[in-house]
Every structure is written in structure tokens, then in C-alpha cells.
């Protein structure tokens, strides 16, 4: 199963550099406590690393078990 990342904006990017604000925007986060689900890709991991002080990340499994 492909992994997904649950990303939540927990701190406002106001007062931080423009590139960190842009990274938050490109992750799809607009409001505080907003949650987005993204694929677990190296590009997304790099974006998260850049704004790790502003977001909360949780790994989730895609889909359910059909057993």
C-alpha cells in the first residue's frame, strides 16, 4: 500500500520568510489547523522539512484491509 502524509498547519507563517510562507501555500495549507493529505514523496518530505516548525505530520496507510 502506498503511504500518505497527513499534514496539519499548527503555527502561523506570519513573521517568517517569504519562502517559508510560499512553501506552506504550496503544500495546500491556508488556515490554521487545516489538514491536507499528500503522497509520501521526497519532494513533499523536503517541503515539510523546510517548515517543520509550523506543521505537524503523521504517516497514514492508504486504503483499508479487504481480508
UniProtKB/Swiss-Prot annotation:
Q: Which UniProt keywords are given for this protein, alphabetically ordered?
A: Ribonucleoprotein, Ribosomal protein
Q: Which InterPro entries match?
A: Ribo_uL30_ferredoxin-like_sf (IPR036919), Ribosomal_uL30_bac-type (IPR005996), Ribosomal_uL30_CS (IPR018038), Ribosomal_uL30_ferredoxin-like (IPR016082)
Lineage, top-rank taxon, reads: Bacteria
The record's listing under Pfam families reads: Ribosomal_L30 (PF00327)
* Similarity remark: Belongs to the universal ribosomal protein uL30 family.
Keyword Ribosomal protein in the entry? The reply is: yes
Matching entries from Gene3D superfamilies are given as: Ribosomal protein L30, ferredoxin-like fold domain
Q: Which NCBIfam families match?
A: rpmD_bact
Q: What's the name of its gene?
A: rpmD
Cellular component, GO, one term: cytosolic large ribosomal subunit
Name of protein: Large ribosomal subunit protein uL30
What lineage is on file? Bacteria, Thermotogati, Thermotogota, Thermotogae, Thermotogales
Amino acid at each position: 500500500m502506498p503511504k500518505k502524509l497527513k499534514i496539519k498547519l499548527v503555527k502561523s507563517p506570519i513573521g517568517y520568510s517569504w519562502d517559508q510562507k510560499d512553501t506552506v501555500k504550496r503544500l495546500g495549507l491556508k488556515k490554521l489547523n487545516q489538514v491536507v493529505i499528500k503522497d509520501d514523496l521526497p519532494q513533499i518530505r523536503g517541503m515539510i522539512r523546510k517548515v517543520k516548525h509550523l506543521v505537524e505530520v503523521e504517516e497514514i496507510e492508504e486504503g483499508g484491509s479487504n481480508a
